[in-house]
């Protein structure tokens, strides 16, 4: 890029981004930046892989933008950052999309289509979606190693999962067995508890009577799942609860019901009984061992009747609500299963993986379980066993991918027994540092403590096959199985000839591979891994381990990972679980956990609600850099982000302000052939304001670095934007612009150039991780061939201690506050800043404020356009102020009686120069001609300024520091300069109309309707000529003419460029 080249008048994000994309391609900016840091200290970042099941949404965009910003920051800090992007390409997220595309309803459709065909479709879909996602990420300005992403479908990555699983097996942490799991009947596979999504639904709510076998009466249970009653195996009670036998009138007689004492009224109410009598009372422990009849024995002949079944047992999950007795079906419920295992009970589950009753369900065989609810309730009612039938609205689990209601059932699954290493998991968790830390110490710790064994098997097709081979007559003992850890081992063991370098490890390949050992043939188990196991090995899978040992030894574990807070139950957990099971260590050292991207109203973005904002829409409206700035101003530590179009527009406005600051000095620097390399800042003729802005830059740099290191890039960005907008644009540029307008090159002008150039270059470096496009364009324009090929190769700035001056910064804070108060006073007096004022009086409340004003009178004089700055020392009153008093008649009346009105009038009539009541008393006595005695309670004082003076208080950081008085009285000299400056502003605007170069000279013709105003303007003809580059004032017959209303006077101005004569 050419140094100080002409730039667009306005910041145009689209144009900037298009140019920068082209430039990056032209100079291989990413590749050169990576190469530039190749010898730096290694920083191992691991990208949490998004599913390749659709385009990027705002949450993905926030996540990827955060990652990109932190990668860029660490590169600028000198690190050699590993930035390999990852993609999760297996599992139900892909399968359900492909099923939808193919019009499939269930697994039977897949089987008819052909397993291999379906796997091929899944692979094509995943690759196709990857391309779209990758283009989305590139459009956000994200720099990662797009040419070499890790894909969970690649053989070397799948091998990493096999290897990790085999290591867990080596530690005796792998077992196969029955568990109660969440099953999606449509997908016909187990899903993890943390994958279950809850919706509010209406379900049956029934109270059922179980007939006692050895005594009169019924146990009463309550359930919302009538379809589990066929599998009822025992009833659970709280052994410490009191249970009552109540006798109720059924209309045809009486019957005895056994319910928990706290639940009697509820049961009686639901049963519609008019009255009841307590006929017995028992502790829960007394009920243990009671036997009962299965309520659906006739309908389900194979219902549990085995040893120990249909008895009452104590359990710790029983609560004192509904009936106080719990229907327990170990073939379904998780706690039921666990208690059943403790009791040594067999498992009865007459339901298939598709949620359809099997033959063992008797009359209900062939029905989908939820569809059978009505028939089961009808049968119970017909037998007189349905005490109450109603509905309940509650949260019920659904499949995370297809939204089908789940069913709880017991199946054979493969597990990594993380419960055996809970202490190790918790210890490894402590080795990682989290931002925010409380997420680790609360939410994550609780999840680990409560997590069951990890069900790693899925009964699906598109996933990493579980690398276990078993014999046909396998007993279920894992020691009798063969676990394969690598492709090399697979090639060595299988009966078929395969190339370990090229073999595809997917199901359609490995299912055909057999292993023969000691005369026994082994075949692979049919399941694939839980997709969370795929991504759980990312920390070594992205390094190509176990194939690539060098990188693993050098880099592992990860220095940093970052994802949203839902990953405490997802990727954060699965990585810790697999890292601990396989290697005994946490696979990451630092975790940054951000929130979710929500709609403007705080609700989740949803197609059904219609409140989704696509990232491309945001880019189209405002540009990638403003979108990134908005996303990066959000707290990344656990808080959810509410999308806001207004805030995104504000960020575009911030960048436009920066653009204007950047654009302002370029023509002057070009005109003067300014060479920043020839001016050393520490030797330049710096003025106070230069020293101040350099000190502010150093302070902001230090504060930003501290925020970045604490993973609060949002706070760092707040500091930077405030510096750009408030310090540089609204203060520094306003002060130094006249130095840059000077006709001759001076030491002062060069110092201003050098200062602003340095500030802008350093600012682009600080901005680069946030807004890489506009930072690139500004940096290139300011540095040309003298800088790096890209700003992203530059070092992150260090605070320059040479220029740190906290006192000066505080001084200018006070000066800026005085200036703001002075501007407010001008507005009250309706006096524009272009018009000078005779004086500004600053009454400081404290010595520090007074010192700052005194030290910087010249700066204040310039900023306030005042001929003189007067300072009133703290503790003193400005002598030109006077005070009037207002009487309080509620106090005067009782004191002065009939004279109160006369006293009040006298108080209101006088003015004093002191707010002491004694001074007022003396003035009133003079007014009345007699002595009186006043007290503080009788009056309140008002401050009166001299005519033409307005006063406004000034504050710093919310603290009152004094009052600024602006004397706006007009003199002929002030009017003359004021009108002249009004003319200058209009002529400058007309120069812009003609798009004149700053050095172009013009001729000017002024026709002023008011003769007095014309005379006043003539007095400052030289000032006007200097400011607008007027070669002469003359009568012009042609040129650019406009009529202006200036302070109610018509002024016709004509200008004509000298070069066009």
UniProtKB/Swiss-Prot annotation:
Cofactor(s) annotated in UniProt: Zn(2+)
Gene3D superfamilies: HUPs, Isoleucyl-tRNA Synthetase, Domain 1, Valyl/Leucyl/Isoleucyl-tRNA synthetase, editing domain
Binding site for ATP: 607
GO terms for biological process, alphabetical: isoleucyl-tRNA aminoacylation
Superkingdom of the source species: Archaea
Motif 'HIGH' region: positions: 50-60
GO molecular function, one term: isoleucine-tRNA ligase activity
Motif ('KMSKS' region): 604-608
Reactions that this protein is recorded to catalyse: tRNA(Ile) + L-isoleucine + ATP = L-isoleucyl-tRNA(Ile) + AMP + diphosphate
Class of this enzyme: ligase
SUPFAM superfamilies recorded: Anticodon-binding domain of a subclass of class I aminoacyl-tRNA synthetases, Nucleotidylyl transferase, ValRS/IleRS/LeuRS editing domain
Alphabetical keyword list: Aminoacyl-tRNA synthetase, ATP-binding, Cytoplasm, Ligase, Metal-binding, Nucleotide-binding, Protein biosynthesis, Zinc
Coiled coil stretches, renumbered: none
Subcellular location field: Cytoplasm
Stored PANTHER family: ISOLEUCINE--TRNA LIGASE, CYTOPLASMIC, SOLEUCYL-TRNA SYNTHETASE
Domain notes: IleRS has two distinct active sites: one for aminoacylation and one for editing. The misactivated valine is translocated from the active site to the editing site, which sterically excludes the correctly activated isoleucine. The single editing site contains two valyl binding pockets, one specific for each substrate (Val-AMP or Val-tRNA(Ile)).
Functional note: Catalyzes the attachment of isoleucine to tRNA(Ile). As IleRS can inadvertently accommodate and process structurally similar amino acids such as valine, to avoid such errors it has two additional distinct tRNA(Ile)-dependent editing activities. One activity is designated as 'pretransfer' editing and involves the hydrolysis of activated Val-AMP. The other activity is designated 'posttransfer' editing and involves deacylation of mischarged Val-tRNA(Ile).
Family: Belongs to the class-I aminoacyl-tRNA synthetase family. IleS type 2 subfamily.
SUBUNIT field: Monomer.
Name of the protein: Isoleucine--tRNA ligase
Protein species of origin: Natronomonas pharaonis (strain ATCC 35678 / DSM 2160 / CIP 103997 / JCM 8858 / NBRC 14720 / NCIMB 2260 / Gabara)
Gene: ileS
């Amino acid at each position: 890029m050419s140094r100080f080249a002409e730039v667009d008048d306005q910041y145009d994000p689209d144009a900037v981004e298009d140019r920068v994309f082209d430039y990056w391609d032209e100079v291989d900016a990413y590749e050169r930046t990576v190469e530039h840091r190749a010898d730096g200290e290694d920083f191992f970042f691991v990208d949490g892989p998004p599913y390749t099941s659709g385009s990027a949404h705002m949450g993905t965009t926030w996540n990827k933008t955060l990652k990109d910003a932190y990668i860029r920051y660490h590169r600028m800090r000198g690190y050699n950052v590993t930035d390999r992007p990852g993609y999760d390409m297996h599992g139900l997220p892909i399968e359900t999309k492909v099923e939808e595309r193919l019009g499939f309803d269930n697994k039977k459709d897949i089987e008819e289509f052909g397993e291999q065909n379906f796997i091929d479709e899944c692979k094509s879909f995943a690759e196709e979606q990857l391309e779209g996602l990758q283009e989305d990420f590139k459009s956000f300005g994200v720099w990662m190693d797009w040419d070499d992403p890790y894909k969970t479908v690649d053989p070397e990555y799948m091998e990493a999962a096999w290897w990790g699983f085999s290591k867990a097996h080596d530690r005796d942490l792998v077992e196969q067995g029955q568990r109660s799991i969440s099953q999606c009947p449509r997908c016909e596979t187990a899903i993890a508890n943390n994958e279950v999504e809850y919706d509010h639904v209406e379900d049956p709510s029934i109270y059922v009577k179980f007939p006692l076998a050895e005594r009169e009466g019924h146990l009463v249970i309550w359930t919302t799942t009538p379809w589990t009653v066929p599998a009822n195996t025992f009833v659970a009670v709280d052994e410490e609860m009191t249970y009552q036998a109540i006798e109720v009138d059924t209309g045809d007689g009486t019957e005895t019901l056994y319910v928990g004492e706290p639940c009697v009224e509820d049961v009686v109410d639901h049963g519609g009984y008019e009255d009841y009598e307590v006929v017995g009372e028992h502790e829960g422990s007394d009920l243990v061992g009671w036997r009962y009849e299965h309520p659906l024995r006739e309908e389900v002949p194979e219902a549990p009747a085995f040893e120990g079944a249909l008895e009452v047992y104590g359990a710790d999950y029983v609560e004192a609500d509904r009936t106080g007795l719990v229907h327990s079906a170990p073939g379904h419920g998780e706690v039921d299963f666990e208690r059943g295992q403790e009791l040594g009970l067999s498992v009865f589950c007459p339901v298939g993986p598709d949620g359809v009753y099997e033959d063992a369900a008797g009359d209900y065989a062939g029905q989908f379980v939820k569809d059978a609810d009505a028939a089961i309730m009808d049968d119970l009612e017909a037998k007189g066993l349905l005490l109450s039938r109603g509905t309940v609205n509650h949260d019920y689990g659904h499949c995370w991918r297809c939204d089908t209601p789940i069913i709880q059932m017991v199946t054979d699954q493969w597990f990594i027994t993380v419960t055996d290493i809970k202490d190790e998991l918790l210890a490894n968790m402590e080795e990682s540092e989290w931002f925010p830390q409380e997420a680790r110490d609360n939410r994550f710790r609780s999840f680990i403590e409560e997590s069951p064994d990890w069900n790693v098997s899925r009964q699906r097709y598109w996933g990493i096959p579980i690398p276990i081979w078993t014999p046909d007559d396998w007993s279920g003992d894992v020691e009798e199985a063969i676990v394969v850890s690598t492709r090399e081992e697979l090639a060595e063991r299988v009966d078929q000839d395969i190339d370990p370098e090229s073999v595809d490890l997917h199901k359609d390949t490995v299912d055909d591979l057999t292993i023969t050992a000691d005369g026994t043939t082994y075949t692979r188990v049919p399941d694939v891994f839980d997709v969370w196991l795929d991504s759980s090995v990312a920390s070594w899978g992205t390094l190509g381990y176990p194939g690539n040992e060098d990188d693993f030894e050098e880099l592992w574990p990860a220095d940093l990972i970052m994802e949203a807070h839902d990953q405490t139950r997802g990727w954060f957990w699965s990585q810790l679980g697999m890292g601990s099971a396989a290697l005994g260590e946490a696979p990451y050292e630092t975790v940054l956990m951000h929130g979710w991207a929500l709609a403007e109203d705080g609700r989740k973005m949803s197609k059904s609600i219609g409140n989704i904002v696509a990232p491309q829409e945001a880019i189209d409206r405002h540009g990638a850099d403003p979108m990134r700035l908005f996303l990066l101003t959000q707290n990344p530590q656990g808080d959810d982000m509410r999308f806001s179009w207004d805030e995104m527009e504000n960020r575009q406005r911030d960048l436009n302000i920066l653009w204007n600051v950047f654009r302002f000095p370029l023509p002057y620097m070009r005109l003067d052939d300014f060479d920043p390399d020839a001016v050393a800042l520490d030797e330049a003729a710096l003025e106070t304001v230069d020293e101040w802005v350099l000190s502010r830059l150093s302070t902001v740099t230090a504060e930003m670095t501290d925020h970045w290191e604490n993973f609060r890039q949002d706070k760092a960005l707040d500091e930077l934007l405030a510096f750009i907008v408030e310090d540089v644009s609204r203060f520094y540029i306003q002060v130094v612009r006249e130095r840059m307008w000077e006709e001759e090159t001076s030491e002062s002008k060069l110092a201003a150039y050098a200062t602003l150039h340095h500030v802008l270059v350093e600012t682009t470096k600080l901005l680069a991780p946030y807004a890489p496009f506009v930072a690139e364009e500004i940096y290139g324009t300011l540095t040309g061939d003298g800088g790096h090929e890209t700003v992203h190769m530059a070092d992150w700035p260090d605070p320059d201690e040479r220029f740190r001056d906290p006192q000066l910064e505080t001084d200018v804070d006070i000066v800026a506050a005085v200036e703001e108060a002075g501007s407010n006073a001008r507005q009250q007096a309706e006096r524009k800043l272009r018009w000078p004022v005779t004086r500004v009086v600053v009454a400081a409340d404290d010595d520090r404020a007074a010192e700052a004003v005194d030290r910087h009178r010249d700066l204040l004089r310039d900023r306030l356009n005042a001929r003189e700055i007067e300072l009133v020392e703290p503790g003193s009153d400005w002598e030109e102020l006077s005070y009037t008093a207002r009487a309080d008649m509620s106090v005067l009346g009782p004191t002065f009686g009939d004279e109160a009105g006369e006293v009040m009038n006298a108080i209101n009539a006088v003015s004093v120069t002191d707010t002491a009541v004694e001074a007022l008393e003396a003035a009133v006595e003079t007014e009345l001609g007699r002595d009186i005695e006043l007290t503080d309670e009788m009056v309140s004082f008002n401050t009166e300024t001299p005519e033409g003076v307005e006063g406004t208080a000034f504050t710093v950081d919310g603290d009152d520091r004094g009052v600024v008085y602006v004397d706006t009285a007009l003199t002929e000299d002030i009017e003359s300069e004021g009108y002249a400056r009004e003319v200058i502003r209009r002529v400058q605007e007309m120069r812009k109309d003609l798009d004149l170069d700053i050095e172009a000279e013009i001729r000017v013709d002024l026709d002023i309707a008011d003769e007095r105003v014309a005379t006043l303007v003539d007095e400052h003809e030289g000032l006007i000529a200097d400011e607008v580059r007027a070669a002469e004032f003359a009568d012009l017959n042609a040129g650019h003419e406009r009529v202006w209303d200036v302070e109610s006077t018509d002024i016709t101005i004509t200008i004509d460029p000298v070069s066009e004569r």
